[in-house]
UniProtKB/Swiss-Prot annotation:
This is Ribose-5-phosphate isomerase A. The lineage of its organism: Archaea, Methanobacteriati, Methanobacteriota, Thermococci, Thermococcales. InterPro entries: NagB/RpiA_transferase-like, Ribose5P_isomerase_typA_subgr, Ribose5P_isomerase_type_A. It comes from Pyrococcus abyssi (strain GE5 / Orsay). HAMAP family: Rib_5P_isom_A (MF_00170). Disulfide bonds: none annotated.
Length: 229
């Protein structure tokens, strides 16, 4: 099984948690894109009804509309029943790093409010500790980026401003901010680090998602595996 197939079987497994009348947080990224398309197919076939999707980014909003999923913003719904999203790293306690797609702030706002947060990954994303392979993305107020990069050196982080691809200059988030990618030596206490990073003035949100995932569905070469907290 290749990586795309692993992502797809994880996405398919998540459909088992979807019921009529649900408000669903729609994450960002290539794995969640499979879920959004499959959810759209379910709606078209009449297998589920009265679904509302709350997208976490322009990417997921456009894809949800294209897939025939009715969408709303967070302030238009009373509650989020379930949220489904990908991740860049998952540690053994199901703490996450997210934000490669620069959508971490809306993802955290929506997913922290969900009745159930389901994470979809392929087996490459499982790590022994956070920051083993990937940096922590940090959304920052543009003017503050240099001061924050300097401040991150206290944590021995290698931090750099994320630059655009097919765009000159830095990546601009859906909220009009910059992203700093900070590679820490390792993160032993994700909750503590998540809180600490958010106390730096100018930081809008960071990509450590500690103690928030309820279920992680992993696509592996052998099939799908479900991890629960
Ligand atoms: C976007 C994210 C993504 O969910 C994460 O980067 C995983 O993406 P993919 O499924 O494409 O590997 O956090 O901000």
């Amino acid at each position: 099984m290749n990586i795309e197939e692993m992502k797809k079987i994880a996405a398919k497994e998540a459909l088992k948690f979807i019921e009529d009348d649900m408000v669903i947080g729609l994450g960002t990224g290539s794995t969640t894109a499979y879920f959004i398309r499959l959810l759209g197919d379910m709606i078209k076939k009449g297998e589920v009804s009265d679904i509302v999707g709350v997208p976490t980014s322009y990417q997921s909003r456009l894809l949800a509309i294209e897939s025939g999923i009715p969408v709303a913003t967070l302030d238009q719904v009373d509650a989020i029943d379930v949220a489904v999203d990908g991740a860049d790293e998952v540690d053994p306690n199901l703490n996450l790093i997210k934000g490669r797609g620069a959508a971490l702030t809306m993802e955290k706002i929506i997913e922290s409010r969900a009745g159930m947060f389901i994470v979809l990954v392929d087996e490459r994303k499982l790590v022994d500790y956070l920051c083993q392979k990937m940096p922590v993305p940090i959304e920052v107020i543009p003017q503050a980026w240099r001061a924050i990069v300097e401040e991150l050196s206290i944590f021995n982080a290698e931090a750099k401003l994320r630059m655009g691809v097919n765009k000159d200059g830095p990546v601009i988030t859906d909220n009009g901010n910059f992203i700093i990618d900070a590679k820490f030596p390792r993160i032993d206490d994700p909750l503590d680090m998540e809180i600490e990073l958010n106390t730096i003035p100018g930081v809008v949100e960071n990509g450590i998602f500690a103690d928030i995932a309820d279920i992680v569905i992993v696509g592996t070469k052998e099939g799908v595996k479900t991890l629960e907290r």
